[in-house]
Amino acid sequence: MSPELAAPLLVIEAHPLQTTIVAIFAVVYLGMFLGGLPKLKLDRSGVALLGGIAVVGIGAMTTEEAARAVHLPTILLLFAFMVVSAQMRLGGFYTEVTRRVAALPLAEPWLLGALIFVAGALSAVFSNDIVCLAMTPVVARLCIERRLDPVVFLVGLACAANIGSAATLIGNPQNMLIGSVLQLHFADYLWQALPPVGLGLLALWAWLVFARRRPSTVNVEALTVDRENPPIFDRLQTAKGLAVAAALLVVFLFTDWPREVAALVGAGVLLLSRRFHSSHVMGFVDWELLVLFVGLFVVNHAFESTGLAAAAVAWLAAHGIHLGDSGPLFAIGVGLSNLVSNVPATMLLLPHLKTPEAGVALALVSTLAGNLLLVGSIANLIVVDLARKQGIAIDWRQHLRIGLPVTALTLAITALWLAR
């Protein structure tokens, strides 16, 4: 064993506190892998929260140190865009856009392409999870009414939302984290990410057009439309939300105003409403995701203090494997993202990346890897859950038949683009 790796291990043997920290870290990331802990009614957010509490409880960190471990700009940016997305959802924007696209008199391949484009574009500005939450019921009803293969359209929707969200530093939580921690410039990232994302959406469409030739595994004829009441389209509130979102994009692209501050101001403007009560808007904020971030920040910071993570990175470097290089980062990023999901994977890898180029690669890889497995992205699970309520069952095998080739294609496109 190399001296670099042996030293931290000797420290752990001599200090039970550090051994306990490592044990807490292992249990927390086991929970990230399993989606909870066996025999306990805990999801990933609950596991992360209890991990943070345990770290403070054993005296590894004071409450003040735990608070400093949380990257507040990321939390504030996440919260602010949850408010913006809530405004758009309450205004019926997502449902109305999807309904209008579904009503277009297009042949099946072109309709599929239109839905992929819309889902990808919306996810680049708003949360991919929210986009899937709003679009899935409409797309499911479209498939039932037109007798289209729902697996192709719904898995395509999830993949498009994931791919599209990689285009900007506000498209998904892990990109917000990477952009905030590494201080990536919004416009610079956009110009680097837009080509592989655009080509990735095109590759997704091409593969789905090919995949739809196979016989459908769902008997669409036996399905009936579930007429639930979507939000009523409110032009004024939608215009208000779009105006704030557009203003924020301009600020991000052309000014140096901190993104989290600008986003908070935008969220504050939206909360000044005579139509939507603030408590109603806050009800659409994903508090569990914020808790997940806070808990993982604390647990990861405690683990970093043991020196094990730095020693592991040094050991890899001594064997010619550098995390900053695209090859190892792609392999480790894809593997971790599908083991523990993309947000925890990003939080593990991010402290060891020092260059903007590595940050861009991680943002793209961790997001695109979410299409591989059904559990690789929350957006995938949202689509499957809402489809089930319409009587459409999508299992992990059906997802993998589309997700595997799409992930391989999009990662290959990204690798070629970044290596140019």
Can you name each region flagged by the protein language model?
Residues 64-151, 287-358:
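Membrane-embedded alpha-helical segments and adjacent helix-loop junctions characteristic
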Residues 126, 131-138, 182-185, 360, ...:
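Alpha-helical transmembrane segments of multi-pass membrane proteins predominantly involved
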Residues 142, 146-214, 220-225, 359-362, ...:
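Membrane-core helix-loop-helix motifs of multi-pass transport proteins
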